[in-house]
């Protein structure tokens, strides 16, 4: 608390928390999903974040999120640019796929309302993180102004208190904590409980692209999809780009986490570089 309920202190807490969950699972010889209630589904449905929609479809994904080409200061040109992109995306993926759009904090309230109006015909599943996370009043105003598209946010909100404010003010429809930034799996479970009590779903940021997110997605009933952020170029199989040894990759639009102890990561001890404690000790008390 001394370092605040969010920001870098919470990000640091996240790494420690995830490591402790992995350790607990290994000590108990159980996958982490068994320690947080067990699986509620055989495999988790994924959506992919990528602008390479043809390649994403070829890989078996059925639901999609695209990036943002505009900032609010672009005015009418920005509106036209985004509508052109979303119209093209909808044509490619068809009407039987969920389509999401992420402005990544690039809008103010006025521009977000205009954009939501423009994108009405394309049946977006949600509009993601249009405003900066500190603008609670803006989120409240925006949610009241548009009722035809759900609002999602949370990857840059840190700690359960910021999510509680969103939920208490009914300023959001989808909570998106990032387990590496929000405080870890322990904090994400508390955020999930806050949302669940209010009838709000939680779909963590990039869950399908991390072991901890995969375990969350398979265990939480009110988490109907898991995001897979695809950083690969077209033609490169996902298995060749797996960032963490032992982590499963999506198949046919679904993800199933490892059932190995902990998060199932295969980290070799020789990869870990010991920290030189003497350097820190020698600087103790120095200003």
Where on the chain are the PLM-derived regions?
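Hydrophobic faces of well-ordered beta-strands that scaffold small-molecule active sites
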Residues: 42-49, 64-66, 97-103, 127-128, ...
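Short, small-residue-enriched loops and turns at beta-alpha junctions
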Residues: 70-79, 103-111, 128-136, 158-160, ...
């Amino acid at each position: 608390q001394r370092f605040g309920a969010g920001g870098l202190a919470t990000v640091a807490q996240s790494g420690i928390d995830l490591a402790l969950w992995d350790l607990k699972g290994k000590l108990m010889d159980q996958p982490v999903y068994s320690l947080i209630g067990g699986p509620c589904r055989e495999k988790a449905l994924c959506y992919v974040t990528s602008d390479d929609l043809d390649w994403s479809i070829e890989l078996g994904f059925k639901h999609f999120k695209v990036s943002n080409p505009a900032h609010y200061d672009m005015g009418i040109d920005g509106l036209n640019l985004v509508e052109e992109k979303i119209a093209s995306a909808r044509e490619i993926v068809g009407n039987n796929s969920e389509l999401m759009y992420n402005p990544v904090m690039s809008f103010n309230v006025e521009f977000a309302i205009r954009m939501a109006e423009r994108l009405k015909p394309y049946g977006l599943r949600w509009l993601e993180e249009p405003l900066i996370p500190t603008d609670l009043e803006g989120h409240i105003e925006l949610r009241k102004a548009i009722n035809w598209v759900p609002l999602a946010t949370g990857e840059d909100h840190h700690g359960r208190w910021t999510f509680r404010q969103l939920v208490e003010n009914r300023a959001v429809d989808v909570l998106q904590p990032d387990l590496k930034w929000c405080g870890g799996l322990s904090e994400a479970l508390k955020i999930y409980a806050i949302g669940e009590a209010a009838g709000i779903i939680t779909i963590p940021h990039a869950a399908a692209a991390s072991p901890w997110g995969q375990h969350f997605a398979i265990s939480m009933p009110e988490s109907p999809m898991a995001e897979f952020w695809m950083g690969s170029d077209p033609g490169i199989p996902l298995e060749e780009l797996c960032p963490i040894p032992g982590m499963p990759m999506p198949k046919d639009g679904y993800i199933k986490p490892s059932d190995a102890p902990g998060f199932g990561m295969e980290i070799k001890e020789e990869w870990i570089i010991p920290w030189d404690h003497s350097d820190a000790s020698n600087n103790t008390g120095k200003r």
